[in-house]
A protein has these predicted regions:
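Gly/Ser/Thr-enriched, mixed-charge loops and adjacent short helices
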Residues: 13, 113-242
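Proline/glycine-rich low-complexity loops and linkers
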Residues: 80, 131-173, 178, 264-337, ...
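N-terminal small/polar loop signature for handling phosphorylated ligands or for N-terminal nucleophile
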Residues: 40, 48-112, 204-262
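Short glycine-rich phosphate-binding loop at a beta-alpha junction
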Residues: 42-54, 188-190, 291-297, 432-434
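An N-terminal, well-structured beta->alpha segment
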Residues: 1-68, 72-73, 162-186, 395-399
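Gly/Ser/Thr-rich active-site loops/lids in small-molecule metabolic enzymes
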Residues: 126, 215, 267-286, 354-364, ...
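Phosphate-binding and adjacent anionic-ligand microenvironments
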Residues: 248, 285-461
């Protein structure tokens, strides 16, 4: 991770740690850089960069700032307006854009925002390009064998254009609809749009496929995105599904790159359930290439036990859909994701896509003629206790011999009945201690043992 860009973009509180000036500079660099790459390849046409945003009040400010920077550098800016992160990735890839930009802080509260950069393949922008952006922001850019204390401005007819590109968002919606291989007619579906990016897309897609669609949290006002809504506050959808007697519910986050489900009984279907359900579905049809589902180290122990019973292999990556996709692309895997609901179907998308995930879950229900509760039933989620310990030095705490010995003792005691995971937070001075076991008391006992050692060694703040 760099100074500004983490695993999921440049994120911070709008106007404090992420400002309009930052956005302008990101636009200035990207517009200039992609024009320069074109010129080096003998292409005199201006760079084309597509931009989407979520519903936060500050997203409009950042959109205008990015457009100012891009056009000042001579690039053309194409505006999808309010849309989802996966739609930007899709359009960047299929419409031959130099890159894509999504303005969103995903599941964070309204006062945060972020800038996610996407390359021309619809994938997260390479680290080396992000480092160049950061160097320009800090006034120390060196690229093309030269220092660039300032970038040239475009002038006259070379100033970039701004293009209303809502047609791109509509094209993405058409693509999603085309993936629906069964009619949804007669199925009562609940959608929680988190007052975010999916509010003007998800219902239209489900309606087009014939569902009886009921929606909550689809009235964004700039301040209510993720506010007791969406996949991080799924209790609202649970209640809605039960009260309305719906067949299934789907909850998205602020930029709709993740999805969690609610079955007809009001139970939460996590990302681990989704991986299990679709992994089994693909294996039954002989389409689970490499016989592997890609997970992260945070997936539940019960998922791996269930995969073992089904004869399905699995891989574990670091936390972050970026790492999941990297493994999938390198090893030819078709499905992977996170417990949080970032699910990647590599045949159809290059990033997690919440609406696509919900369509795929509908496909399994309709193909197997089973309710969601029955599809999820074989997966037994193990009780989990997770404690975040704020420490003075997270690396020293995790690598301390006494801490490692305590972790080893717990792992030995659990054997094949559970697991312990101790890892550093990527963004905070925190060590996370997590235990999964057959019962909650066992989890708590072993978490306490490790946390006590961290405290005894003087690391806890």
């Amino acid at each position: 991770m760099g100074k500004y860009f983490g695993t999921d973009g440049f994120r911070g509180e709008a106007g404090i740690t992420l400002t309009a000036d930052h956005a302008y500079k990101v636009g200035r660099f990207l517009g200039w850089y992609y024009n320069a790459l074109r010129e080096r390849n003998g292409d005199t046409d201006p760079a084309r960069i597509v931009i989407g945003k979520d519903t936060r009040r500050s997203s409009y400010m950042f959109e205008y700032s990015l457009v100012a920077g891009l056009t000042a550098s001579g690039a053309d800016a194409y505006l999808l307006h309010v849309t989802t992160t996966p739609s930007v990735a899709y359009i960047a890839r299929v419409d031959d854009f130099d890159c894509g930009i999504m303005i969103s802080a995903s599941h964070n509260p309204y006062y945060d925002n972020g800038i996610k950069l996407i390359d021309c393949y619809g994938e997260k922008m390479p680290e080396e390009t992000l480092l160049l952006v950061e160097d320009y922001i800090d006034g120390k850019l060196h690229v093309f064998n030269k220092d660039w204390p300032e970038l040239p401005f475009a002038h006259r007819e070379h100033i970039g254009c701004t293009v209303d590109y809502v047609a791109g968002r509509n094209r993405y919606m058409g693509y999603l609809i085309s993936l629906g291989i069964y009619s949804f007619k007669g199925v009562k579906v609940g959608l929680d749009c988190a007052n975010g990016s999916s509010w003007n897309i998800a219902k239209s897609v489900f309606d087009a496929l014939g569902a009886d669609t009921y929606v909550i949290n689809n009235k964004p006002n700039g301040l209510n995105i993720n506010n007791n809504a969406g996949s991080t506050h799924i209790e609202g959808l649970q209640k809605f599904v039960v009260e309305k007697g719906l067949d299934v519910g789907f909850a998205y986050d602020g930029d709709a790159d993740r999805c969690l489900c609610v079955d007809e009984k009001g139970n939460v279907i996590t990302g681990d359930h989704i991986l299990y359900i679709y992994g089994c579905y693909m294996k039954e049809r002989g389409k689970l290439l490499t016989n592997t589902v890609v997970t992260t180290v945070m997936s539940n122990f019960g998922l791996y036990k269930a995969f073992d019973e089904q004869g399905i292999g699995y891989a574990k990556t670091a936390v972050g859909d970026k790492y999941v996709y990297e493994y999938m692309a390198k090893n030819g895997c078709r499905i992977g994701g996170e417990q949080s609901g970032h699910i990647i179907f590599s045949k159809y998308a290059s990033t997690g896509d919440g609406i696509l995930t919900s369509l795929k879950m509908m496909e399994v229900m309709l193909a197997k003629k089973k309710p969601m509760s029955e599809l999820a039933a074989p997966l037994k989620i193990y009780p989990q206790v997770l404690e975040n310990v704020r420490v003075t030095d997270k690396k020293a705490a995790q690598n301390d011999p006494a801490v490692q010995e305590a972790v080893s003792k717990v792992a030995e005691a659990l054997g094949d009945t559970g697991r312990i995971l101790v890892r550093e937070s990527g963004t905070e001075p925190v060590v996370r201690v997590m235990v999964e076991a057959p019962d909650h008391d066992t989890c708590q006992k072993y978490v306490d043992e490790v946390v006590n050692v961290i405290c005894e060694k003087g690391y806890k703040v």
